Regions:
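Primarily recognizes the serine-hydrolase "nucleophile elbow" in alpha/beta-hydrolase
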Residues: 139-188
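Short N-terminal helix/helix-N-cap motif within the alpha/beta-hydrolase-1
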Residues: 94-98, 124-125
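N-terminal Sec-pathway targeting helices
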Residues: 1-16
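Short beta-strand element of the alpha/beta-hydrolase
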Residues: 78-90
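N-terminal cap/lid segment of alpha/beta-hydrolase-fold proteins
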Residues: 32-79
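Short beta-to-alpha linker loops that shape the active-site pocket of alpha/beta-hydrolase fold enzymes
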Residues: 90, 118-122
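Short amphipathic alpha-helix adjacent to the substrate-entry channel of hydrolases
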Residues: 98-116
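Membrane-interface motif at the C-terminal end of an N-terminal transmembrane signal
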Residues: 20-36
Length: 188
């Protein structure tokens, strides 16, 4: 094989490799941009029977420390309703409370107040940060209970996926003093 033909083949291979790398980089960048765009866009509940208070900060020291409160639109000021504290899923590294609001608004229509809690995500914030934040959110609601039609004698705590694990561990700590002590939590 002569030298010119060899260099033509090598140049062609290099062009193909560079093209594949550039195409992959552009595709990856486009996918990341789309993912970030979807995360920024608000999920609307579009439910006229539900009043929504969004992005209430319950802790000023950690990111993601906001909660949404949903209640029936027609509740009168003297009524107290059962409250559901909810944490979203996402494998501890993704997700946002807003994505569950449409489903949770259907529960609200049945006569509940829902407190939908966001938390700081891994890997930047390690366990047990979400548990600490969930406790902070509950304490925030306890301190502000007179502002909302909440009956703290009727409480449901739940979540989906990672949120289900976190909330069930939180409940276990509330009912098991040795676990609570091992985790370094105080019952407030």
């Amino acid at each position: 094989m002569n030298t010119q033909k060899k260099w033509t083949i090598i140049t062609g291979v290099i062009i193909v490799i560079v093209s594949v790398v550039v195409a992959w980089g552009l595709y990856h960048h486009q996918q990341e941009s789309e993912k970030k765009k979807q995360q920024r866009e608000k999920v609307q509940i579009n439910n006229p029977n539900v009043k929504l208070f969004q992005n209430i900060t319950y802790n000023n020291h950690l990111p993601g420390s906001q909660l949404d409160i949903m209640m029936p639109d027609d509740v009168d000021k003297d009524t107290k309703l059962p409250v559901i504290f909810w944490m979203h899923g996402g494998g501890y590294v993704a997700g946002d409370k807003q994505y569950k609001n449409p489903l949770l608004s259907q529960i609200v229509e049945q006569g509940y107040v829902v407190v939908n809690v966001n938390y700081a995500l891994a890997p930047n914030y390690k366990y047990p940060t979400p548990l600490i934040q969930f406790d902070d959110a509950i304490q925030f609601i306890k301190h502000n209970k007179d502002r909302f039609p909440i009956d703290l004698d009727q409480v449901v705590i739940g979540g989906d996926s990672a949120g289900a694990q976190l909330t069930s561990q939180y409940v276990a700590m509330q009912t098991n003093s040795s676990l609570r002590s091992e985790m370094g939590f105080e019952q407030r």
